[in-house]
Amino acid sequence: MSRENNSRFAILATLVAFLLVGGISLILWAVTGRLDSAERIPSQSTNVATGNRLPESIRSKVSAGEQVLFPEASEDKTEAVEAIAQGNYANAVTVFNSALEDNPNDPESFIYRSNARIADEEAVTIAVVAPANGNTDIGLEILRGAAQAQSTINRNGGIDGMPLRLVIVDDRNEPEVATAIAQTLVEDNSVVGVVGHYSSDVTLATVPIYEEGELVAITPVSTAVELSGISPYLYRTVPSDSFAAAALAAYAIFYEEDLNVAVYFDAQDELSASLKEEFISFVDAWGGTIVEQYDLSRANFDPRVQREAQQNGAQALMIAASSNTLESAADVINYNKRRLPILGGDELYNRNILEATGPDSLALTVAVPWHLLARGVDEGFVTASRQTWEGDVSWRTATTYDAVITMAAALDEAPTREGLKQALDSSDFTVESATGPVNFLPSGDRRQVDRLVQVQPGRRSGVGYDFVPFVVDGESEE
């Protein structure tokens, strides 16, 4: 690539970031509005931290430490959970210490141990919603960020002098389950805020419930554009798909100079469809062409459709996968055999993708909100996370850490639902966190852009290939 095109790409990327942060979210605000909700006083008949009066269908998916939600619990972990259920908190802490010595990378045990240290002390309660059964690896990534944030907050004096208690909620990443859980959280007056959900489809399903119940939710991972401005009670610490799509389209057209792109997506998934549509809009605006579109969710999907795409002039592939179509996405990557560059959304930032595709993954360029090796990251957070989890953490861990830290900072002045909402809406509200300053546009979107990562041979993932920050020729991450 020429030095001139390097310069064009860098200038364009900066301009796009400025326009997106300052413009798109504000336009969405003007178009969609954020409806005022009627007053509603939550019921005090349930308590998710204790399981009091919870329906059995919900009780089995909620835990502050009295039951294990994630599969494959060790004997020590099972014993510690039983100790919490019996109110023997000191013993629970001791046994959790043993469990974490054997498996230091287990955030569920980490959170339960922190809760056991609080015991029956008055605390501020936040619910963290993550899939424990199905998409388990993603759920664990989310919980690592929440667990590390809880530890940091409590070590530094808590929230308004009170410790932070986290309640883990497994919504199975299913809209029907998530809406029932959201209603339960709204009705529990002890829960002052929610961190979640995972997929954009699930978050979209729960938004009306949180708005009606006037309960703030901060999602650390849902990126669909449709979430921008949808409710005054929804915020996110992750950029919307507009930022990822712009970064990927700019890379394809102005850096690789690939004007013709074939797109793969999941027609059944809101996030996938959102990223696809945004990407197409930017490609069209910048003079490129979408030569073909293929649905990864089709029962008879065949990666050999790439031959048709190339016959029609495709110079690059873009994969907007969902969590349900990662296997098909891996098939596309493997079939490509590095013939064409492949662009992807953050769902492809996944160790399983690297493992399944091996050297074929070297064609990948992926847009993500954060990377621990990128220039300007919070080295303190990176060091602490490595010490805590004995390994590298993903962007999902970092943005979840942001969400919990942000919610705690907003609650510090007034640890109530109303106080949280007022603080987050303040024009001068800003919190320094793992991925940088956190503040929100009127749409609830964060003022942040995505960055690009590429695959190179490496050891960090344990499968021989790693995601590393993309650097424009002649620049350095140092």
Predicted features and spans:
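Extracytosolic ligand-binding ectodomains
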Residues: 2-478
